[in-house]
Amino acid sequence: MSRIGKQPVSIPDKVKVSVKDGTVFVEGPKGRVQKTFAPAVKVTVADKQVTFAPTEESRFAKAMYGTARSIVAGMVKGVTEGYTKDLEIQGVGFKANLKGKQLDLALGYSHPILLDIPEGIKITVTDQTKVRVEGADKQLVGAVTAEIRGYYPPEPYKGKGVRIVGERVRRKEGKTVA
């Protein structure tokens, strides 16, 4: 059995948690998040706590038991505090701008890259080289951040590209001329 799964998740005062047909809905000041779990895990809400129990003794049920608890704990944290990821753009002429519900990236290509901002995500751009992705859904914040970074990952020779703040880019030496 999972030691993580045995611990209940406590619900803060300003958060509402409900379960319907294996789907957990968490609503709080920062937004609303929902996640559907496999029928191998039973999720119950009682007196300001969410508890988890495997419905069968299979290996899959034991694995999902702790995973479900961790995901719901992350959902509660997301709707109370929120998640943020900061990106940094390095390179001559590389910049980012917000145009309505789209993020406009100029990354050295012949065309601008327009990224539609998904529902539940807030993007802020400061001085055209710093992008902050915020939201209540941890998975969605990470996915949007990875998508932005994927347009031009940092390259090892000059170091230009889109990187997550704090990410260490391994630098390489260029060709040596004899």
Swiss-Prot record:
The entry's keywords: Ribonucleoprotein, Ribosomal protein, RNA-binding, rRNA-binding
Superkingdom: Bacteria
A Pfam family the protein falls into: Ribosomal_L6
An annotated GO BP: cytoplasmic translation
Keyword 4Fe-4S appears in the UniProt entry: no
PROSITE patterns the record matches: RIBOSOMAL_L6_1 (PS00525)
Family: Belongs to the universal ribosomal protein uL6 family.
Subunit structure: Part of the 50S ribosomal subunit.
Protein name (database record): Large ribosomal subunit protein uL6
Record organism: Opitutus terrae (strain DSM 11246 / JCM 15787 / PB90-1)
